[in-house]
Amino acid sequence: MSKCGRKKYMRTNVRQMTMETVESQQDRSVTRSVAEHSSAHMQTGQISVPTLAQVSVAGSGTGRGSPAVTLVQLPSGQTVQVQGVIQTPHPSVIQSPQIQTVQVATIAETDDSADSEVIDSHKRREILSRRPSYRKILNELSSDVPGIPKIEEEKSEEEGTPPNIATMAVPTSIYQTSTGQYIAIAQGGTIQISNPGSDGVQGLQALTMTNSGAPPPGATIVQYAAQSADGTQQFFVPGSQVVVQDEETDLAPSHMAAATGDMPTYQIRAPTTALPQGVVMAASPGSLHSPQQLAEEATRKRELRLMKNREAAKECRRRKKEYVKCLESRVAVLEVQNKKLIEELETLKDICSPKTD
């Protein structure tokens, strides 16, 4: 046999061997897929499992790398060509998540607990309603002492608004002055003053906040509509100081309100300086300052700062002088020691010079 014949014979043998291996692998893959399909149908609960009537495997291909074609005949009589692809099975990486079961149980409240809560709320309301008011306690304590001003109780909303009051509702705080006047302060900052002869809050007159052209710093201007006979009154006002202005007529005499001490007590008197008619100023030692007082305060602070600076400079100069004196004394000591060392050096030279000769 020639060499060409041997080569052809070997090639045909190799092709047959490769085709047989491909067909065997395709048969294995088909049987595996059929088994998996049947097992899946059995797991899902299907009773009838479709079976393949005929599976014929035919290998076609001329080259070594050409894929093989598988003919699969279905029960309905159809023939399907399936191109075999050999794949190595990979283990599944998907892991089933761990599910934690949480049981939620709702506990219904019993009727006893609900009844106890209702009873507790009723008791709390009764205790709060039985408590005496702060003004009632003060009135009971100050009823025996004539010097302490009496604090009037507030009128309830059921009694209605007094007929003489047209610009505000029932006041929240009512005070009685030493001369018998009633002063009412509402939540919005409105002040009302009644005459001594009026009953309760009847005859209260409104004091409204206004703005003037150039008010002093820290002052507040209000409208004043009442006037006493003697011209001197004292009343207690919680909060900031006020400036009182006559509301009835522009020709009425003006008044000045001055606060003395830490207690907010104001004395109304005639002004000594030329002020606009009907306008008065309220001055307080702690909060209101005139421009002259502000200038004096600034001058005093400046002088105090200069005095502190002078004292600090004097102390600095004194320390510098002490340091210079200390340095001078050290220089003097070093000069004396230097002279002694020079003398000792000369004596040593004199002693050593004859020996060398």
Curated annotation (Swiss-Prot):
Gene induction: Isoform 11 is expressed in a circadian manner in the adrenal gland with an expression peak at ZT20 (at protein level). It is induced by cAMP in an immediate-early fashion and can repress its own production via a negative autoregulatory mechanism.
Protein name from the UniProt record: cAMP-responsive element modulator
Principal location class: nucleus
Residue ranges of the region described as Disordered: 20-43
PTM-bearing positions, type Phosphoserine: S116, S142, S284, S287, S290
Taxonomic placement: Eukaryota, Metazoa, Chordata, Craniata, Vertebrata
Quaternary structure (record): Binds DNA as a dimer. Interacts with CDC34. Interacts with FHL5. May interact with TSSK4. Isoform 1 forms a heterodimer with CREB3L4.
Known tissue expression: Expressed in the testis.
Residue stretches making up the bZIP domain: 299-357
Location(s) in or outside the cell: Nucleus
Cited function: Transcriptional regulator that binds the cAMP response element (CRE), a sequence present in many viral and cellular promoters. Isoforms are either transcriptional activators or repressors. Isoform 2, isoform 3 and isoform 4 are repressors, while isoform 1 is an activator. Plays a role in spermatogenesis and is involved in spermatid maturation. Binding of isoform 1 (activator) to CRE is increased by CREB3L4. The CREM isoform 1-CREB3L4 heterodimer functions through CRE and may recruit HIRA to CRE to regulate histone exchange.
GO cellular component terms listed in the entry, alphabetical order: cytoplasm; membrane; nucleus; transcription regulator complex
